Amino acid sequence: MIVRKNMGRAKSLLMLLMVLGFFFATYNLVSMIMDHRAGNWVADGLESFDRKMLGSASTNAKYHVALTATDAAYSQWQCRIMYYWYKKVKDMPGSNMGKFTRILHSGRTDQLMDEIPTFVVDPLPEGLDRGYIVLNRPWAFVQWLEKADIEEEYILMAEPDHIFVNPLPNLASRTQPAGYPFFYIKPAENEKIIRKFYPKDKGPVTDVDPIGNSPVIIQKSLIEEIAPTWVNVSLRMKDDPETDKAFGWVLEMYAYAVASALHGVKHILRKDFMLQPPWDRHVGKTFIIHYTYGCDYNLKGELTYGKIGEWRFDKRSYLMGPPPKNLSLPPPGVPESVVRLVKMVNEATANIPEWDSLNRS
């Protein structure tokens, strides 16, 4: 499925964001945005948060699963596995999943349009991401939220390298979205930098949660307000050399955390939201496997992280095309989480049509 409309509106909105982002470069841009009430898409901190979060929604409300992606083979094969497991767990007891959308920010259709529900949006103007493609994520969400018809009251912001390992309920409450605490997102330890974007008059630096935008379950009305601020903060962070150097590949995650704080939003921190092999060894009642790290082991089942193992599974080994079917299982002694990951990848690749031939870069 493809939905694409009113791109002119989206481009106009981007121009507005860029003007705000660069015209006020010598001032605190975010403060200016928060005071700019004429634009309905950015609200006024805690007042907006209270207004939106005191609605009638209950925590068993359905949420829409949304992930951003490109048309590169590396992104495509991960999306196919993710969508396979979404369909497997969607209607299981305990799940509050609604519909699914792959937000494709390549600006054009690809060969998965008929397989995965997809909404095509524009990428940032050429060169604006400075090679950091993840900057397209907040802008993709802004466009999708503005133009798509979304039935659910809540949204799960997910990523292609997520696998649903257990049915996922709506973890958000009536007053707070739910997020996952990342050990490497440390606002307090980076207070000097955070204060460039979250000044002292806004509150303590502990207002900034140790999260990224994914996984997060959040009310649609709330992310509609946060997303444009997220775009602005991301661009400002990337434009600041000190911030860019300090935050590196997690810059966009910090930007979401700061944008949320600017809107007075605190997240429920759920460690059981997600596990990340090989560091998290057991699946238990966790809901999502995030296979962002390489898993390298010797044949004794000992982790050799940082050194290519005699047995390995690393998504980056498959940049140009999908992994083969029936990957070898890890040797004895490897943690359950890694074994479960490989088995789930194998099940998906065995059942997805045209796995070996569809998406090659």
Swiss-Prot record:
Pfam families with a match to the protein in the record: HPAT (PF23452)
Membrane topology classification: Single-pass type II membrane protein
Ligase recorded as keyword: no
Free-text disruption phenotype from the record: Dramatic increase in root nodule number when inoculated with Mesorhizobium loti. Inhibition of root and shoot growth.
Bilayer-spanning residue ranges: 13-33
UniProt entry keywords in alphabetical sequence: Glycosyltransferase, Golgi apparatus, Membrane, Signal-anchor, Transferase, Transmembrane, Transmembrane helix
Cellular compartment(s): Golgi apparatus membrane
Primary localisation category: Golgi
Name of the protein described by the UniProt record: Hydroxyproline O-arabinosyltransferase PLENTY
GO cellular component, one term: Golgi membrane
GO function terms (MF aspect): hydroxyproline O-arabinosyltransferase activity
Stored PANTHER family: HYDROXYPROLINE O-ARABINOSYLTRANSFERASE RDN1, PEPTIDYL SERINE ALPHA-GALACTOSYLTRANSFERASE
Job of this protein: Glycosyltransferase involved in the O-arabinosylation of several proteins including extensins and small signaling peptides. Catalyzes the transfer of the initial L-arabinose to the hydroxyl group of Hyp residues. Probably involved in the arabinosylation of CLAVATA3/ESR-related (CLE) signaling peptides that move from root to shoot, to interact with receptor kinase signaling that regulates nodulation. Involved in long distance nodulation signaling events.
Region forming the signal peptide: none
Reaction equations catalysed: trans-4-hydroxy-L-prolyl-[protein] + UDP-beta-L-arabinofuranose = O-(beta-L-arabinofuranosyl)-trans-4-hydroxy-L-prolyl-[protein] + UDP + H(+)
EC top class, as a word: transferase
InterPro entries assigned to the protein according to its UniProt record, in alphabetical order: HPAT-like, HPAT/SRGT1-like
EC number assigned by the record: 2.4.2.58
